[in-house]
Amino acid sequence: MQNKKYYIEKGTKKFIAVTISLFLAGFATFSILYCVQPILFVLSQNFSLSPAQSSLSLSSSTAMMAIGMLFTGPLSDKIGRKKVMSSSLFLAAFFTFCCSKMNSWEHIIFMRALTGLALSGVAAVAMTYLSEEIHPNTLSFSMGLYISGNTIGGFSGRILSSILAEKFSWKISLEWISILAFVFAILFLYLLPSSKNFHSIALHPKKIFTYFIAQWKHPIVSKLFLMGFFLMGSFITVFNYVGYRLLLEPFFVSQETIGILSIVYLIGVYSSPKAGILIEKYGEGRMLIISLVIMIVGLIISQWNRIIIIFLGLFLFSAGFFAAHSVTSTCIGQQARNNRGYTSSIYLFSYYLGSSILGTISGIFWTIGKWTGISTMVIIFLYIGIVLAIKLNYIIDNANELK
């Protein structure tokens, strides 16, 4: 009886509480993380920076988030999921408020790095909490809803920062977003049910390193780690530099319009849970291949020099991305038999490391070939993803036949 699981079922009050609280956590986390993305051009002008240098305001956060996940995951295995997530939200809101008061580029990067480190506690632990507490039959649906909350948060942070930066200043935009995140942190602390299936695990540094290496040797999980790296790297690269494309000749759109363009993210509210459901019909590998092909098609469409066509291309690209992310997140939760918190942390470490490295390096290709250079690089990243998905599909199909 000691190992009996007390899962939260779909339709119950606790399920609703989990959905709302993790939606708020995702909203706060990703509005803070991505609020600088649509104002990279503004930061370039204010501090006389190149596109690649300006992108460090985002890459510093995602890099520190990636590193932090290697520690916050194991920390949550020891002290509990809710404690880590709650503390992370409050700290991230505080660092973002401090960032809004900085006047030098170096100090801004430092504060953004601290913000990313704080946010790692939510990003690393939320999927683990769901995998432990939600009934397995509902997990893919619930994971999709969580990612939908992330999507809306990312969209809202981007559009809010764009509008406030145009009407007032980039400092005011960060200040308002930090206050909103603080309110959501309070609601999260109050609403989220305490873990029922959590069992504390003592992880020492040597064991953490050993487990890290072991997971990279796993035939399925290791490929999911690489998939996350190229997926997120591709997504961030496109949205880091599309603003530069549209703010310059021949479009000259407003900063506010760049924020509104983020509305394409809302397709993730549909495609994330939908992909979770379609896994049962087509399998993880096939769903990943379909999602990646949709991303490539969207990117090709975005080459046309008409804003409505570019919008359509980004819409398809985003739909494919959020579907693929939902599939990989669900698969990680299912494959991690022990130390789920740390396995999820390694996946997200790879995911955000891809964002940091590829998102900044791709600035060189913007300088060389503008949008064509960016698109070429991203298609190469996605082609690697398709190769990984084909291998995953083969391994998973063979494993299912042996059952």
Model regions and ranges:
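Helix-loop-helix hairpin linking two adjacent transmembrane segments in secondary transporters
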Residues: 107, 136, 145-192
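C-terminal transmembrane helical hairpin of 12-TM major facilitator-type secondary transporters
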Residues: 285-328
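Extracytoplasmic
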Residues: 17-51, 72, 238-244
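Cytoplasmic helix-loop-helix junction between adjacent transmembrane helices
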Residues: 111-152
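Helix-breaking motifs and short loop linkers at transmembrane-helix boundaries and internal kinks
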Residues: 48, 80, 101-107, 118, ...
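Paired small-residue
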Residues: 91, 95, 106-114, 308-316
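Juxtamembrane intracellular "pre-TM" segments in multi-pass secondary transporters
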Residues: 2-12, 193-225
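Conserved MFS/SLC helix-loop-helix module at the cytosolic interface between two early adjacent transmembrane helices
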Residues: 67-106
